[in-house]
């Protein structure tokens, strides 16, 4: 089993697909990486040579921020926006959608479950 950037790649999948298991690498970055290193995208992970795995590892480490480094950078960016008080930071702080989505009826994932609000009490019969 090949291990790149702290992620075990699935042995039975094509390399092009297996690379997408690494956080920060999608299909297009996977294709770019394989083209730059000269590895055939149709090769199965189990058939990769140690030399090819080493080439992939070096290319990814040199050119992309992935996994823990990328997660840390994203969290720092969000924290910075919250500290400077920009609109996106305020939305993050209030746990509301950040990218302009409506909140009147939707946004349940971000806002969480509905909170019950006490309704009007019915007037009793006299």
Swiss-Prot record:
Gene Ontology MF term list: rRNA binding; structural constituent of ribosome; tRNA binding
Assembly, per entry: Part of the 30S ribosomal subunit. Forms a loose heterodimer with protein S19. Forms two bridges to the 50S subunit in the 70S ribosome.
Gene encoding the protein: rpsM
Residue ranges of the region described as Disordered: 94-126
Pfam family, any one: Ribosomal_S13
InterPro entries hit by this protein: Rbsml_uS13_C, Ribosomal_uS13, Ribosomal_uS13-like_H2TH, Ribosomal_uS13_bac-type, Ribosomal_uS13_CS
Coiled-coil features, chain-numbered ranges: none
A Gene Ontology term for the protein's cellular component: cytosol
Record carries keyword Ribosomal protein: yes
GO biological process: translation
Cross-referenced Gene3D superfamilies: 1.10.8.50, 30s ribosomal protein s13, domain 2
Main function: Located at the top of the head of the 30S subunit, it contacts several helices of the 16S rRNA. In the 70S ribosome it contacts the 23S rRNA (bridge B1a) and protein L5 of the 50S subunit (bridge B1b), connecting the 2 subunits; these bridges are implicated in subunit movement. Contacts the tRNAs in the A and P-sites.
Family: Belongs to the universal ribosomal protein uS13 family.
Protein name per Swiss-Prot or TrEMBL: Small ribosomal subunit protein uS13
HAMAP family according to UniProt: Ribosomal_uS13
Domain of life of the source: Bacteria
Keyword check for tRNA-binding: yes
Keywords annotated in UniProt: Ribonucleoprotein, Ribosomal protein, RNA-binding, rRNA-binding, tRNA-binding
């Amino acid at each position: 089993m090949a291990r790149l950037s702290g992620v075990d790649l699935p042995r039975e999948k094509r390399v092009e697909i297996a690379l997408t298991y690494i956080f920060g690498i999608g299909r297009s970055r996977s294709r770019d990486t394989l083209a730059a290193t000269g590895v055939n995208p149709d090769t199965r992970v189990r058939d990769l040579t140690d030399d090819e795995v080493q080439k992939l590892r070096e290319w990814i480490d040199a050119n992309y921020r992935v996994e823990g480094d990328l997660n840390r950078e994203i969290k720092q960016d969000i924290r910075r926006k919250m500290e400077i008080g920009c609109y996106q930071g305020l939305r993050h702080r209030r746990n509301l959608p950040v990218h302009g989505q409506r909140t009147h009826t939707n946004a349940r994932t971000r806002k969480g479950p509905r909170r019950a609000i006490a309704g009007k009490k019915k007037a009793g019969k006299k």
